[in-house]
């Protein structure tokens, strides 16, 4: 389990003993164990066989594939799980960016793999993607419903992610190791949707991560890690706008626990509660999943992220040597 949040305690011939996050115990157990009727060890540990299956209390390999359970929980937050629900319940407000979801058949996924290898793609798939781009308004951002190809930007392979034709869109997806990971891997949970999303040129400094636990907004932090004087100057305006958004959004929030990425722009029109806030995406919650905690720390800030009565708001501060 690469990059596992679980601590390896010891390794035996037939299994490995891991400890799981004690501070997020209830959430962890509910998602990964209770639903499958797995008994829990009193010492906060579980045993995993060499094949990746949970060992029961009789030291027998169960049929419960641990990483499959974890990945299936992460997949609950993919775009196709929440987009239509938000649009249906947003009362015709601009709540997230216009998106066209294209469900991929096994044949389509094979065609994308063949394009990555041989550079050939069926005209029928090109037409479906081109039609979706036209429907969105000709300038789009493309991703799988699991991941975006932002690794290409981080690696300086491209300047931005906007596309206006199907061939460019397919090339971005198949060039991105991040996207290919969930399209072509041997994982039991793979992405079966392309998401053609409206491309809007926005200031990413105004992106924020919201932490929702037990249906309550507990904390908010800027998505970036660098000090931004403009954000500090507008701190109250931004915080008030996010709370104004949440005042209406909490009744339709699709998840009891999640991290929610949003963006603020005072030029946004017809937003929920006139908040100038739009939802970008949802991700999982807790150190046992795959979403990071931004400026917070899952362990150190456990009480704040799960029990805060008033949403905590955090911006990056100046490094001490520059003050």
UniProtKB/Swiss-Prot annotation:
* Highest taxon of source: Viruses
Instruction: Supply the InterPro entries for this chain.
Output: CDC123 (IPR009772)
Instruction: Return any one Pfam family short name.
Output: D123
Q: Which family does it belong to?
A: Belongs to the CDC123 family.
The protein depicted here goes by the name Putative CDC123-like protein L884
Please report the organism this UniProt entry assigns to the protein.
Acanthamoeba polyphaga mimivirus
């Amino acid at each position: 389990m690469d990059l596992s949040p679980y601590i390896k305690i010891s390794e035996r011939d037939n299994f490995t003993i891991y400890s799981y996050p004690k501070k997020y115990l209830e959430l962890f157990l509910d998602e990964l164990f209770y639903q499958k009727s797995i008994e829990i060890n009193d010492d906060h540990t579980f045993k995993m066989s060499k094949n990746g299956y949970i060992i029961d209390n009789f030291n027998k390999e169960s049929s419960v594939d641990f990483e499959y359970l974890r990945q299936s929980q992460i997949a609950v937050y993919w775009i196709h799980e929440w987009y239509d629900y938000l649009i249906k319940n947003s009362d015709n407000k601009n709540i997230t960016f216009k998106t066209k979801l294209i469900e991929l058949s096994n044949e389509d996924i094979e065609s994308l793999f063949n394009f990555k290898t041989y550079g050939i793609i069926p005209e029928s798939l090109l037409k479906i993607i081109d039609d979706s781009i036209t429907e969105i308004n000709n300038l789009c951002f493309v991703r799988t419903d699991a991941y975006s190809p932002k690794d290409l930007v981080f690696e300086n392979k491209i300047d931005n992610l906007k596309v206006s034709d199907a061939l460019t869109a397919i090339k971005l997806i198949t060039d991105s190791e991040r996207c290919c990971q969930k399209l072509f891997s041997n994982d039991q949970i793979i992405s079966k949707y392309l998401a053609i999303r409206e491309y809007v040129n926005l200031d990413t400094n105004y992106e924020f991560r919201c932490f929702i636990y037990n249906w309550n907004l507990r904390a908010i932090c800027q998505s970036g890690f660098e000090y931004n004087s403009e954000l500090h100057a507008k701190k109250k305006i931004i915080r008030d706008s996010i709370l104004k958004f949440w005042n209406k959004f909490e009744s339709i929030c699709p998840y009891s626990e999640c991290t929610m990425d949003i963006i603020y722009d005072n030029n946004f029109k017809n937003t929920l509660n006139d908040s100038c806030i739009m939802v970008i995406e949802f991700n999982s919650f807790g150190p046992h999943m795959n979403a990071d905690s931004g400026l917070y720390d899952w362990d150190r800030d456990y009480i704040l992220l799960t029990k805060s009565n008033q949403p905590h708001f955090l911006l990056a501060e100046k490094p001490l040597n520059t003050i």
